[in-house]
């Protein structure tokens, strides 16, 4: 069987599992009166979303993990790369699950403490490095203008920075109905194409499994959202994306393919620096999607424009570097 056909089966499997079990989670949360607490610092009109079921990411993460494992096993391709990708998605998903669970239990918007979340994110990244190093993985990192540097210490630091950074970047982007979902479909779709060209079945099947779950999730997450992915979804998606870029030996590609995630994070950093040094804010509100909301843009307009930016930049990357 061709790698594309097998990967498409993984996509359909993940999609079907998510479509079946997501309504179950939604109904369960409604029946137990559980839902997302909306932060007071956000746009005031977001308060009407308070009580919307959350933790939807739990479903599509589990669906993707089940799908990629059984399809890879079926194709006799359940190798270390598959396990590294699964651990990144599941590991960061578990961190998000804990964060979401604390928020729901205590009926507040604060889950894990920042240092607790960071420590757990670093641990998952280190575990991935240890698994990779046990199989004579090539620890080569391309540094612009310096070439490839072979250093396990440098590579470890980079992986920690990349996984922690992008898991949080996707998390910051998950502030509007459907926004992070659409952006992630574009990014994972781009990497699926790259993996197909490289004939990398493990990464292709993984990306397609995630895409299948996200397509199904989007049915329930577009505006007005019936459920949010929560940190269980956003942290998992970001950690998975960062790991995919590394497994394809194209980590820097994520700066362009994931340009919206980068801009969302940069807007928060710049806002903090500006306010602490000058007492003035650069943006009306951060992350930057809220800035455009404050300018009068509808959620749908922000979503569509941001999705298009992500899509155009992904196409641009493929056009230049293939």
Swiss-Prot record:
GO BP term, example: cell wall organization
Pathway: Cell wall biogenesis; peptidoglycan biosynthesis
Topology in the lipid bilayer: Multi-pass membrane protein
EC number, UniProt record: 2.7.8.13
One Pfam family matching this protein: Glycos_transf_4
Source domain of life: Bacteria
PROSITE patterns according to UniProt: MRAY_2 (PS01348)
Cofactor: Mg(2+)
An MF annotation (GO) of this entry: metal ion binding
Subcellular location: Cell membrane
One GO CC term, this protein: plasma membrane
Reaction catalysed by this enzyme: UDP-N-acetyl-alpha-D-muramoyl-L-alanyl-gamma-D-glutamyl-L-lysyl-D-alanyl-D-alanine + di-trans,octa-cis-undecaprenyl phosphate = Mur2Ac(oyl-L-Ala-gamma-D-Glu-L-Lys-D-Ala-D-Ala)-di-trans,octa-cis-undecaprenyl diphosphate + UMP
Transmembrane stretches, start-end: 9-29, 54-74, 82-102, 122-142, 145-165, 176-196, 200-220, 227-247, 255-275, 302-322
Alphabetical keyword list: Cell cycle, Cell division, Cell membrane, Cell shape, Cell wall biogenesis/degradation, Magnesium, Membrane, Metal-binding, Peptidoglycan synthesis, Transferase, Transmembrane, Transmembrane helix
NCBIfam families referenced in this protein's UniProt entry, alphabetically: mraY
Stated family: Belongs to the glycosyltransferase 4 family. MraY subfamily.
Role, per record: Catalyzes the initial step of the lipid cycle reactions in the biosynthesis of the cell wall peptidoglycan: transfers peptidoglycan precursor phospho-MurNAc-pentapeptide from UDP-MurNAc-pentapeptide onto the lipid carrier undecaprenyl phosphate, yielding undecaprenyl-pyrophosphoryl-MurNAc-pentapeptide, known as lipid I.
HAMAP family: MraY (MF_00038)
Protein name: Phospho-N-acetylmuramoyl-pentapeptide-transferase
Gene from which the chain derives: mraY
């Amino acid at each position: 069987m061709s790698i594309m056909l097998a990967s498409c089966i993984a996509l359909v499997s993940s999609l079907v599992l998510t479509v079946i079990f997501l309504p179950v989670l939604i109904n369960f949360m409604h029946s137990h009166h559980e839902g997302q607490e909306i932060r007071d610092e956000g746009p005031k009109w977001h308060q009407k979303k308070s009580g919307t079921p959350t933790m939807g990411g739990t479903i599509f993460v589990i669906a993707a993990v089940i799908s990629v494992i059984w399809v890879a096993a079926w194709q006799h391709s359940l190798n270390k790369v598959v396990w590294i990708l699964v651990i990144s998605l599941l590991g960061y998903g578990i961190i998000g699950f804990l964060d979401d669970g604390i928020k729901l239990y205590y009926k507040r918007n604060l889950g894990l403490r920042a240092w607790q979340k960071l420590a757990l994110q670093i641990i998952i990244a280190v575990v991935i490095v240890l698994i990779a190093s046990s199989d004579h993985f090539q620890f080569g990192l391309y540094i612009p203008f310096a070439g490839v540097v072979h250093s396990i210490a440098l590579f470890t630091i980079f992986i920690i920075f990349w996984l922690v950074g992008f898991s949080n970047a996707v998390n910051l982007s998950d502030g509007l109905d459907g926004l992070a979902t659409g952006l992630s479909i574009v990014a994972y779709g781009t990497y699926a194409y790259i993996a197909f060209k490289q004939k990398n079945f493990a990464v292709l099947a993984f990306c397609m499994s995630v895409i299948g779950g996200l397509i199904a999730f989007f049915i329930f997450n577009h505006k007005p959202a019936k459920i949010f992915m929560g940190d269980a979804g956003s942290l998992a998606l970001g950690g998975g994306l960062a790991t995919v870029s590394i497994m394809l030996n194209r980590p820097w590609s994520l700066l362009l393919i994931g340009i919206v995630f980068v801009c969302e994070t940069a807007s928060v950093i710049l806002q903090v620096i500006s306010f602490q040094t000058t007492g003035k804010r650069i943006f009306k509100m951060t992350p930057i999607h809220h800035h455009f909301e404050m300018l009068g843009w509808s959620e749908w307009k922000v979503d569509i424009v941001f999705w298009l930016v992500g899509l155009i930049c992904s196409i641009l990357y493929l056009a230049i570097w293939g």
